[in-house]
Curated annotation (Swiss-Prot):
Enzyme Commission (EC) number: 6.-.-.-
Annotated GO MF terms: ligase activity
Protein name: Putative cysteine ligase BshC
Alphabetical UniProt keywords: Coiled coil, Ligase
Enzyme class of the recorded protein, top EC level: ligase
Lineage: Bacteria, Bacillati, Bacillota, Bacilli, Bacillales
Gene: bshC
Amino acid sequence: MEVREVPLPATTKLAADYITGAFPAEKGFGYARTDDEAFRRRLIHLQTRTYDRHGLADYLQAYHRRFSASAATMNNIDKLRDENSVVIVGGQQAGLLTGPLYTIYKIITIIRLAKEQEQKLGVPVVPLFWIAGEDHDIAEVDHVYVVEDGEVKKVVYPHKLKEKQMAADVPLDRQLADAWIERVVKTYGETDVTNELLSFLAACLDDSHTFVDFFAAIVLRLFADDGLVVLNAGDASVRPLERRFFAALIDRHRDVTSAVLAQQEALRALGYAPLIEIAPNAANLFYYDGRERSLLHYDEESGLFRNKTGSVALTKQQLLELAEAKPACLSNNVVTRPLMQEYLLPTLAFIAGPGEIAYWAELKEVFALFGMEMPPVVPRLQATLVSRSLQTDLVDIGLEAADVLSGRLEAVKQQWLKATAEAPLTEAFAKAKADIEAAHRPLRELGVAIDRGLEGLVAKNAAIIQAQIEFLQQTLERALLSKHEVEWRKFWRVETSLRPNGAPQERVWNVFYYVNRYGFDFVEKLSAISNPGNGMHKIVYI
């Protein structure tokens, strides 16, 4: 496995500037990405904070027993009881089969940084993945993309949801899930690994009742030897650990919103467009009754916290009582989730994708509201996988993988199409037919002059010659078409693999396509990539 690094700009301007150091870190973050002492200084800060470490470890141990988690994982959970222990954390929604590749890349970055900093700092550093199980946008996680019948297709798990349930509560039907997995894996093609892959996924389903269960079961098995720990943010059993901070968020809901809006204005002044959509009356919490998750806002006129439809209307006191007695009725939004993470976990660093980097910059002042400090934000591994056969295609069309990532493929393809469309066959054969007709005409006239009875013969001879030219033209056209089909398929394969539907590979394809092709140690090999969080895009030749 060969790795080449290229400086590919992030999808958002702020993230791109943060990664390169062009963004003034003090304007949006707690630490500069280039600060070599950031982790050591962050550790000193964490040692001044207190956490409910035993409550957290007790909860996590109970949760992980459901999945028969590895000894390495259970040992890492136990490390959290140590007052000196810290975590490297990153998170994502619970995509089926883990969703796009970037989720796996994020986990790899978490694990690698945890191992690295444990050696450097001499304290226990636990790799933890925050599963966004409280998210209710199931359409973002209910599918994977495959190549089927020569097209990129979205294969959706056939659930029927009428309400905005949390992903942690969305059930998986075993029969439907088995059929869905079989269809997906079938598109990958039969290999020596296929039966092992199907058995692996079936075993994961054995431990799963919901979307989040299935996600957790998969990643805990894939990264069992690395001791990965997961935290399901949609689990009702974690809410008692959060109740005190829910109360703080309710009590200071106006301040939270004001701090975000003020920071957004500060970023606009620097030339950066905010990503978080937040209304002046936002409460930044969701109410959840087990079926419907609805965002709350504060109605100044009535003094009530309401949802959009008005079916929920609570006084501040009622909401505080709910946080204490029934914390499972509350969940965080994009603003408060990072704060709750900071409250629960002694976070040494947060592993972020480009979008997260950009929106976390909008939260700097909110952390300060609660006496918190934003942890160092580290870019996740960004990578593009290139197979040997695909590299051959790239050579044939005269491009490097980096050219495709930087947007050159379309221009080269259009040049090829233009050259193909102007192939001179039609013009050449039209001229040849005219020239042959002009050359044959005097011969016909001479034959008829010698013997008028030869008129039919010379005419037939002319037709035979033209028919042979027509046959040659058709033969060359078929050969040209065949040649172009071969070339066209090269462009198609390159585009489909590296920029499917015009999107980055890591945002479309699923890791199990590659596992089916290269084996389960493929993930282990990816985990060995050097400097996964240095902000450089990795082109991985496999």
